[in-house]
């Protein structure tokens, strides 16, 4: 289980990403579409002043059950370990154990 502080940090990042998503996209579009050097520089400065944690790259999807940051399936919001446990118990329908 991940520490509560890590889970809270990720939830805070998720809120910041959603809050600044539109503003960040507008500035990026302005930078890409503009031909004026001055406008580009001003837009880049505004983009740099946005909170660092509002960048979507910094947001990590975590397992809803244990908080593990790696190997999380988006469809279930569970890591591979918890997903297997839930499949074996029968909480997720349609799963079957592989054999080859």
UniProtKB/Swiss-Prot annotation:
UniProt: Zn(2+) binding residues: 63, 66, 79, 82
Signal peptide extent: none
SUPFAM superfamilies given in the database record: Glucocorticoid receptor-like (DNA-binding domain)
Stored Pfam families: Ribosomal_S14
Cellular component aspect of the GO annotation: cytoplasm; small ribosomal subunit
Cofactor note text: Binds 1 zinc ion per subunit.
GO biological process, one term: translation
Self-association state and partner proteins as the record states: Part of the 30S ribosomal subunit. Contacts proteins S3 and S10.
PANTHER family from the UniProt entry: 30S RIBOSOMAL PROTEIN S14, SMALL RIBOSOMAL SUBUNIT PROTEIN US14M
Family assignment from sequence similarity: Belongs to the universal ribosomal protein uS14 family.
Function: Binds 16S rRNA, required for the assembly of 30S particles and may also be responsible for determining the conformation of the 16S rRNA at the A site.
Protein name: Small ribosomal subunit protein uS14
